């Protein structure tokens, strides 16, 4: 069985070539393009040539007036050609960087910048050979499917034919793209073309598309002026002004809005954020459609707690400040700022605060009970004696004038004076408080140092500001020394014993008389003795401005 192909009508129909170029352009840009092609591929020329393909019938499955199905062997070696235009990337390093992941590719500074060059490619000398399944129907068009890869060879001519490696690269790349085109895209292109030729409904759609293209784009509704146009300042424009604007340029017509619309937009702007055009105007009133969480946080200063209201946190903060002020005035209220801070920080979690505990001070008296009687005296011109109760010195119930187990006996030295270094000892003893007591009979390093000073007989002096007065007073058989306000540095060597010798008692009397005489000499306004004896309740200073 032989077939005669009438190939000349395809050469004469210009509309067929136009539709074929559009379909080929869409097909070439649809498939994934190689990275070297950076622009769209456009089919500029398409010519099927004058030599038709050769068909050999292998099988006919269905044959009727309106349908046909058969398997053919097709071979084509004609003069058809195809011309494409696109843009390619001339810098191969740029292509390499695009196709590689960033963490494995180098980071050149300027060597990978792109260089785009226009490219024109012409495909000619196309040779095809393969098995084709052809199905024809007037209602469904023509379906052409290749059972194998039909492309044998083709010639690629481009702008870079003078560069061998570019020419070879384009040859390989285009051959691969054409193989995909013949296997996937060409059957769909042929089917769409056949539908436009034989199906009348699709012919009507093509006619409507052509009519729309001839009509041109629609008119912009904004170019037609409104009924009451105004300018940007709100001034009403006349017909002559509108005509002059339209003659100058059509762009400024977009800025002409209706005065009524401008009034409604201004009302919407002043509508108290309620999106209502008719919100009543009330002074000192802010309208809100909904109170959000952000506005609640702004009204309460940003203190939001799901467990407690913001007002409780505010009051607790004030309480903590008040407690901090009280703590600077009294040491006993030391726990109040801590409790106030805890109330402030954890008001939502711990509604109750723990009361501050008072520190218990336990005093253990390990000394032996004394048999001395407390005596008292007052300040006189020659001498003064006070009770031996040491509570004025140590602020406790511990006794000072007691019998030591190992009494300290200084040597007899009538010319020696006592050098007292109580500047470093008094703060230490005052800081320890009543919780620290020395055992009876123990000698401290300071006492031994003072004993060595007395035994050497070195002359010393007693400063008026830091040296208290000591006086020995004999009553009956026992010799006692009355102390009042004596610093702890003097207590280390003023221990009284009943077994002292007469010489030692005489030395103590002379020492007491010397101290009393110096006190009497230094007595006066601003002196140490007068301040020590009479400064019990000092009068407050006069007020400012008097």
From Swiss-Prot:
GO terms for molecular function: lipid binding. Residues 349-362 have a biased composition (Basic residues). Residues 1-195 form the SMP-LTD domain. This is Mitochondrial distribution and morphology protein 34. It is a multi-pass membrane protein. Lacks alpha-helical transmembrane segments, suggesting that it resides in the membrane via beta-sheet conformations similar to those predicted for other outer membrane proteins and porin. The SMP-LTD domain is a barrel-like domain that can bind various types of glycerophospholipids in its interior and mediate their transfer between two adjacent bilayers. The keyword Cytoplasm does not apply. Keywords: Lipid transport, Lipid-binding, Membrane, Mitochondrion, Mitochondrion outer membrane, Transmembrane, Transmembrane beta strand, Transport. PANTHER family: MITOCHONDRIAL DISTRIBUTION AND MORPHOLOGY PROTEIN 34. Residues 363-374 have a biased composition (Basic and acidic residues). Belongs to the MDM34 family. CDD domains: SMP_Mdm34. Residues 208-230, 299-319, 344-382, 395-416, 517-546 are annotated as: Disordered. The gene is MDM34. GO terms for cellular component: ERMES complex.
């Amino acid at each position: 069985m032989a077939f005669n192909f009438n190939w000349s009508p395809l050469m004469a129909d210009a509309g067929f070539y136009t539709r074929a170029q559009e379909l080929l352009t869409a097909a070439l840009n649809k498939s994934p393009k190689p990275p070297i092609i950076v622009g769209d591929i456009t089919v500029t020329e398409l010519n099927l040539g004058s030599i038709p393909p050769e068909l050999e019938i292998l099988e006919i499955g269905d044959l009727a007036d309106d349908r046909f199905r058969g398997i053919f062997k097709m071979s084509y070696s004609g003069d058809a050609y195809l011309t494409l235009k696109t843009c390619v990337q001339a810098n191969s390093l740029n292509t390499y960087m695009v196709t590689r992941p960033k963490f494995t590719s180098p980071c050149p500074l300027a060597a990978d910048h792109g260089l785009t060059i226009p490219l024109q490619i012409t495909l000619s000398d196309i040779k095809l050979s393969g098995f084709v399944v052809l199905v024809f129907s007037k209602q469904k068009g023509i379906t052409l499917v290749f059972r194998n890869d039909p492309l044998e060879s083709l010639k690629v001519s481009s702008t870079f034919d003078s560069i061998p490696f570019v020419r070879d690269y384009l040859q390989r790349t285009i051959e691969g793209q054409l193989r995909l085109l013949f296997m996937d895209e060409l059957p769909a292109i042929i089917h769409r073309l056949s539908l436009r030729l034989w199906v009348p409904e699709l012919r009507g759609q093509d006619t409507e598309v052509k009519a729309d293209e001839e009509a041109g784009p629609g008119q912009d509704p904004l170019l037609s002026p409104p009924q009451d146009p105004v300018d940007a300042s709100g001034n009403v424009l006349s017909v002559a002004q509108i005509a002059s604007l339209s003659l100058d340029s059509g762009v400024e017509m977009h800025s002409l809005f209706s005065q009524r619309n401008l009034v409604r937009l201004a009302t919407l702007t002043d509508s108290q954020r309620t999106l209502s055009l008719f919100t009543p105007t009330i002074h000192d009133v802010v309208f809100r459609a909904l109170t959000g969480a952000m506005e609640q946080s702004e009204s309460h200063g940003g203190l939001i707690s799901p467990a407690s209201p913001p007002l409780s946190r505010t009051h607790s903060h004030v309480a903590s400040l008040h407690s901090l002020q009280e703590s600077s005035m009294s040491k006993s209220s030391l726990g109040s700022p801590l409790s106030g801070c805890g109330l402030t920080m954890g008001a939502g979690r711990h509604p109750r605060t723990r009361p501050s505990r008072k520190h218990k001070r336990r005093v253990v008296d390990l000394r032996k009970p004394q048999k001395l009687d407390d005596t008292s005296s007052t300040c006189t011109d020659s001498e003064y004696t006070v009770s031996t109760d040491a509570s004025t010195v140590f602020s406790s119930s511990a006794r000072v004038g007691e019998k030591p187990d190992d009494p300290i006996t200084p040597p007899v030295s009538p010319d020696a004076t006592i050098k007292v270094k109580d500047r470093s000892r008094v703060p230490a003893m005052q800081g320890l408080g009543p919780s620290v007591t020395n055992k009876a009979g123990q000698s401290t390093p300071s006492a031994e140092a003072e004993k060595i000073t007395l035994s050497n007989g070195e002359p010393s002096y007693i400063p008026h500001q830091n040296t208290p007065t000591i006086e020995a007073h004999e009553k009956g058989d026992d010799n006692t020394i009355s102390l009042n306000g004596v610093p702890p540095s003097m207590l280390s060597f003023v221990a009284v014993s009943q077994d002292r010798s007469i010489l030692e008692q005489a030395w103590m009397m002379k020492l007491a008389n010397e101290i009393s005489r110096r006190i009497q000499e230094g007595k006066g306004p601003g002196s140490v003795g007068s301040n020590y004896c009479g400064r019990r309740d000092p009068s407050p200073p006069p007020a400012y401005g008097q």
